[in-house]
Amino acid sequence: MPKMKSHRGASKRFKRTASGKLKRGRAYTSHLFGNKSTKAKRKLRKASMVSSGDFKRIRHMIAK
């Protein structure tokens, strides 16, 4: 049986932390910043963790 391939799009978007969690970037960061407050834009710079409901599915997508 051939090796499973990782999902290349998911591999570029998610990174595993040292504790095993998955880190992701935030949405709403590409354009339309004039409508957003400075506080909102600052919060969007921070990375976030993948929710527990999505963790298992994404983990299988990026498994190597």
Curated annotation (Swiss-Prot):
GO terms for cellular component: cytosolic large ribosomal subunit. InterPro entries: Ribosomal_bL35, Ribosomal_bL35-like, Ribosomal_bL35_CS, Ribosomal_bL35_sf. It comes from the Bacteria. Gene3D superfamilies: 4.10.410.60. GO terms for molecular function: structural constituent of ribosome. Residues 1-26 have a biased composition (Basic residues). Pfam families: Ribosomal_L35p. Keywords: Ribonucleoprotein, Ribosomal protein. One of its GO terms (biological process) is translation. Residues 1-28, 33-52 are annotated as: Disordered. Transmembrane segments: none annotated. Belongs to the bacterial ribosomal protein bL35 family. This is Large ribosomal subunit protein bL35.
